[in-house]
Amino acid sequence: GNFKGKHRVLGVTPEKIGKIAIKKGIPTIIDYFNKRISSKIIKKYGKAKIITATNVFAHIDDINNIVKSIKQTLKEDGVFISESHYLLPLIQTVQYDTIYHEHLRYYSLESLNFLLKKHKLEIFDVKEISTHGGSIRVYASRKGKYKISQRVKKQFKKEKKHLNKKSFEKFKKNVISSKINLFNLIKKIKDKNKNIFGVGAPSRASTLINYLGLDQDIIDCVLEINGSYKIGNYIPGTKIPILDERILSNKMPDFLILFSWHIKDELKKNLKKKGFKGKFIIPLPYPRIET
């Protein structure tokens, strides 16, 4: 919606969020993007100057046909901008909690380059961003259309240094020690008869809870913001209930474990505003207690 009013925009998504976009006045096709939809778009709207795909690639099975359709929909001098959860911060900050069935793959600049090159698209700029605990934004076009930024070369160099067999072996060790340290931290708290609520029920919470073997005797419940469709359900694989965070007004735990730890500063600020006076457990990149 940021471009609306300045440019002609069009969204494509198979999800319910598309209906919200339509209500907000953003033209949206509620369907999966593919060759058929691409042809439909070209016929009705013409080709696009800019195409964006935000956190999309990791969820798509037939990725090559998608890239083919993206290229088909792009103008000759068009730019394709994609954002993907980035492999480099994932292993550096021990984000094992984000490895789950919904994510089919994790991207580096090297792998994105390999994919786009196959379809004669060239990466001419790159940027690391903070989304999802660390993502990579790449700008691509048909070969030779734009000058290649020095940032691309620098990023390849950085990956060569930090993404290798050694780094993955280190990641494996860090995952195991992180699990043990977090479990011991929680055990010490429970040994003192303190109670713990969780905050946020993203998929990563389910991965972490099940990997550690936590249950409702350890985590009383997980809180979600009022209106979340997850309220009234349970964390998969457990009997830990997901409740409305408004229960904090009459039931205050000693500790809150922040499952969306990558936005901990924002969460802590909001929870303190709502009157929480206890302590926070930050599970990753290294387990610790914060006030």
Locate the predicted segments by residue.
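A short glycine-rich, Lys/Arg-flanked "PGG" loop and its adjoining helix->strand segment in the class I
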Residues: N64-I81, K272
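Flexible, glycine-/basic-rich loop-and-beta segments that form/coincide
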Residues: H132-N174
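Short, glycine-/aromatic-enriched active-site segment of Class I SAM-dependent methyltransferases
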Residues: F80-R105, L109-S111
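Conserved SAM-binding strand-loop segment of SAM-dependent methyltransferases
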Residues: G25-K40, P241-L243
